[in-house]
């Protein structure tokens, strides 16, 4: 398995390099019996990974949330849902590829999926606008929300954005208005809404598809009003202080759960979601199914009342 290691994972990377060298050696020379040594190093690597990941700080978790191999929305859609039919365009200006959405089935049940989509290679990153939606992306999302509401389909959103696109053209086309409209409309949808932060939850760019009955975060995701770098630049005029900002802002799942800003934390495989796509998709699917089962018990009136109470409770610990 080819892994991309972060700076704080370098000791793990060194061990994995030794393991790979021994494995290649044993494959070249079948007379060598070094399985014991390989297994010993694998055990050391696993133990070291557990030790490092049991004591991560907020900045390290931020790096995991941004990991280049971390699963994106389309990865989860492919592995959790069936019969996904993507819907495009806002019917007003254009189609923003940083927001993806459409109708799919979850265990044969029709649902509406919305998510931010980043890219991995340079061309794909540009195509997806680095996961930063424009107003037409949010208006496309709103169009899909209203379709879901009309046909009584639960809405499931997957949040992963550094923030809404800050370019002047986005402002000219009504970025603030598009985000605000989504916040208002999501609060009034008469269907169950389940939102999950799968990577970065950046400010209003995340909130525009993040108002729901259940708000979940993956174990190594982040959710904040501004990026640590942005906060550091404003407070200290120095982006090098981003690690301090990350710690002070309380952007990680455990802290946000303590503040009652999220409902559940979805556990990730050892080393992060990118280490085992099967485990993380299974965990996410199980969480969504549990949430849907719970929300299905409520009448439309109760669903809306509970959502209103949730929104009004924010800011009170």
Curated annotation (Swiss-Prot):
EC number(s) on file: 2.1.3.15
Pathway field: Lipid metabolism; malonyl-CoA biosynthesis; malonyl-CoA from acetyl-CoA: step 1/1
Pfam families the UniProt entry points to: ACCA (PF03255)
SUPFAM superfamilies to which the protein is assigned, alphabetical: ClpP/crotonase
Compartments where located: Cytoplasm
Top-level taxonomic group: Bacteria
Residue ranges occupied by any CoA carboxyltransferase C-terminal domain in the UniProt entry: 33-294
Major subcellular site: cytoplasm
ATP-binding found in the keyword field: yes
PROSITE patterns in UniProt: COA_CT_CTER
KW Acetylation (keyword) present: no
Keywords: ATP-binding, Cytoplasm, Fatty acid biosynthesis, Fatty acid metabolism, Lipid biosynthesis, Lipid metabolism, Nucleotide-binding, Transferase
GO biological process assignments: fatty acid biosynthetic process; malonyl-CoA biosynthetic process
Catalytic activity: N(6)-carboxybiotinyl-L-lysyl-[protein] + acetyl-CoA = N(6)-biotinyl-L-lysyl-[protein] + malonyl-CoA
Gene3D superfamilies: 2-enoyl-CoA Hydratase, Chain A, domain 1 (3.90.226.10)
One GO MF term attached to the UniProt entry: ATP binding
One GO cellular component term noted in the UniProt record for this chain: acetyl-CoA carboxylase complex
Family, as annotated: Belongs to the AccA family.
Alphabetized HAMAP family for the sequence: AcetylCoA_CT_alpha (MF_00823)
Summary of the function given for this chain in its UniProt record: Component of the acetyl coenzyme A carboxylase (ACC) complex. First, biotin carboxylase catalyzes the carboxylation of biotin on its carrier protein (BCCP) and then the CO(2) group is transferred by the carboxyltransferase to acetyl-CoA to form malonyl-CoA.
Subunit and partners: Acetyl-CoA carboxylase is a heterohexamer composed of biotin carboxyl carrier protein (AccB), biotin carboxylase (AccC) and two subunits each of ACCase subunit alpha (AccA) and ACCase subunit beta (AccD).
Protein's recorded name: Acetyl-coenzyme A carboxylase carboxyl transferase subunit alpha
Species assigned in the record: Wigglesworthia glossinidia brevipalpis
Classification of source organism: Bacteria, Pseudomonadati, Pseudomonadota, Gammaproteobacteria, Enterobacterales
């Amino acid at each position: 398995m080819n892994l991309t290691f972060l700076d704080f994972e370098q000791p793990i990377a060194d061990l994995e390099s030794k393991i790979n060298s021994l494995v290649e050696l044993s494959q070249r020379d079948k007379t060598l019996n070094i399985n014991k040594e390989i297994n010993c190093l694998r055990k050391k690597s696993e133990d070291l990974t557990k030790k490092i990941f049991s004591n991560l700080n907020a900045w390290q978790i931020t790096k995991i949330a941004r990991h280049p191999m971390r699963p994106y929305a389309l990865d989860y859609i492919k592995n959790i849902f069936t019969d996904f039919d993507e819907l495009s365009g806002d019917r007003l200006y254009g189609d923003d590829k940083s927001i993806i959405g459409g109708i799919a089935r979850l265990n044969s049940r029709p649902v509406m999926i919305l998510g931010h989509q980043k890219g991995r290679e340079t061309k794909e990153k540009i195509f997806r606008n680095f996961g930063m939606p424009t107003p037409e992306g949010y208006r496309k999302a709103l169009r899909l929300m209203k379709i879901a509401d009309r046909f009584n389909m639960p809405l499931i959103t997957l949040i992963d954005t550094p923030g809404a696109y800050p370019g002047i053209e986005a402002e000219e086309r009504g970025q603030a208005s598009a985000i605000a409209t989504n916040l208002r409309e999501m609060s009034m949808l008469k269907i169950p809404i389940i939102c999950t932060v799968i990577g970065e939850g950046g400010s209003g760019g995340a909130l525009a598809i993040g108002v729901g009955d259940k708000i979940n975060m993956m174990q190594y995701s982040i959710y904040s009003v501004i990026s640590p770098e942005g906060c550091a630049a404003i407070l200290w005029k120095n982006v090098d202080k981003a690690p301090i900002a990350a710690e002070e802002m309380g952007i990680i799942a455990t802290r946000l759960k303590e503040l009652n800003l999220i409902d559940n934390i979805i556990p990730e495989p050892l080393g992060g979601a990118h280490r085992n796509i099967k485990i993380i998709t299974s965990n996410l699917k199980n969480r969504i199914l549990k949430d849907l089962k719970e929300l299905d018990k409520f009448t439309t009136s109760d669903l809306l009342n509970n959502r209103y109470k949730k929104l009004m409770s924010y800011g009170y610990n």
